[in-house]
Amino acid sequence: MSDSEKEYGTLHIERRDNIATIHMYNLTDGIVAGRKLDFHWEIAMALGELRDDQDIRVVVMTGAKDGEFMVSPRTPHYEDPGALAGHNEPKGSWKIFNGIIRAHTTLTEMEKPVIARVNGDAAGFGQSLMFGCDMIIAREDARIADIHMGMGDVAPYGPPFALVPGDGGASLIPLYMSPALAKEYLMLAKEYTAREMADMHIINYAVPMDELDAKVDGIVAKLLEKPPLTLAWTKRSVNRYIADQHNRTLDAAAAYEMVNFLQWERAGYKQDMDFE
């Protein structure tokens, strides 16, 4: 590891040739729990590190374990004494939401392609990160949902109260769907499979799990054949549209969600919900 490379507790970075792969850990794994670590902050720092690494030309984001790209914890982690941001704890909440804003800003501005290798379910911040990537290649049976309004009922992830989708979903989803479909997806926490999203032309590819690596590797190889400066300028040109969208909506949505976290009772908190 060079002096410029950092160690993270919620993810690890694998470097091979000119490719960096970010492996994201399950948020409820023991390697994360109780250590006052936060994935939202660390993924922002990791993306910034890779943006500055001139040896890296393509970044791939994936889950550390097959079956899960990145999902919100099912258990009430925000009530755990080891949580970074508990109820009525604005300092920890601000670090989380600042990380969210930095992560999306870096994904948008990074002068190199970022590929989502969706090797399992993507829910909550995981699906927002997925939509923030430049191309999305998923196993066809992966479940994808924005669980903020799910209240624990729609998908088996997320908190037992309603939240504004302030982690990037409210900004990015309207770029992928019509306003009517985007509001149905967000307001009802509607779940799709990757196959359904590919058929709707929302993501690039949905393939069987045993074909995922070949598809990702093929796309990465083609990108590496292109001149890096031309790739960078093409991405920056297209992403002015995405940057404008974030500038209009991301800070406000993040602020609304942070307010939700500070007043659960007003957000329909189901205190008797069984998390087992």
Please identify what each model-predicted range represents.
Residues 1-62:
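Conserved CoA-thioester-binding segment of acyl-CoA-metabolizing enzymes
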Residues 137-142, 151, 203-250:
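C-terminal long alpha-helix characteristic of the crotonase
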Residues 103, 107, 117, 123-185, ...:
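CoA-thioester-processing core
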Residues 29, 35, 55, 63-102, ...:
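Glycine- (often His-adjacent) and acidic-residue-rich active-site loop
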Residues 22, 43, 61, 113, ...:
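Terminal peptide-recognition signature
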Residues 46, 99-111:
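Catalytic-core regions built around general acid/base machinery
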Residues 124, 189-196:
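Acidic, divalent-metal-coordinating active-site segment for phosphoryl/phosphodiester hydrolysis
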Residues 3-4, 8, 25, 37, ...:
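Intrinsically disordered, low-complexity segments enriched in small/flexible residues
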